[in-house]
């Protein structure tokens, strides 16, 4: 069954109609439902229209099926207002042992994304917003993205809906919690986020805690209550950098920066969470632990890639971790005290212009749609101290890779 809630302020009776059509496949069916809207219905008094979609197709990461709902508000023959929204039908659940989409366990594998671009900041059009989603899904082979640390362009979210890219979004903020007036506005921000974005099927988790902030139970009880009231279908998360933090949300989301190249890729769930019966998701890793420029030497760029691989490998080995989001998709502008002296954070697996670093191939070779074969060295001895090429890595999603040392040898045809 399909339940639609609309918000209006009316001075006299009206009729609301709703038409649903299939926008993903070639099905030409549609259904119509109508409901009388009584005088006095306001923005705070929603009314519902109900209908049934016959044999619905489910939205998932491989087949992101979408439907279109068009609603119209009529008084007699006069059309007062109309609206259109796309939506999907899916069952997304976080459990103690991981994340399940439509009943199937799915390991979340994603990156964090800022909404910034070189020179123009956030002022980029629809096409570029959508291109970032394409890069995440098609070039990097990911199934998820975290919109750190604020809700992002609807164009980006719409493309995530179309591609089947899972989204963890959160209300604005970074580390700081202000006074009571500030907190009241933050609760409003959480409410606005959910009202504006809740029809996106790609969104699987609401972030209702200021990123990396300390515990504040009275404040976060309010943000969680708002989220559960406005959208009881989705769980809440709260990104922190604190182990054994007070858990008011449905999912313990934690920035795990344990790995330094020598230490394990991540901490086990039981060492981090305050309630091991609740789901656990790693919301950030790497990033500032090993900033790497696209023009750094090969050793550093290679080490950067291997650190990302180490964390992915560690997460994959622990069945009770729902997944992880690396920090981050691309380099970005920052304030003078946080970058590399040039107001740029070189934390991305891509540079600011979305050109891939070696670490990008680590993620790309996790998918099986596009062949990936990347060598971490140019093999030029002048690039290395003492002409010693050091460790060389081959990043690939192939079942096997054969290397040949002498170019005069004939390659086997099945290599």
Enumerate the language-model features and the residues they cover.
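Secreted/periplasmic carbohydrate-active enzymes, especially glycoside hydrolases
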Residues: 1-159, 163-167, 189, 204-205, ...
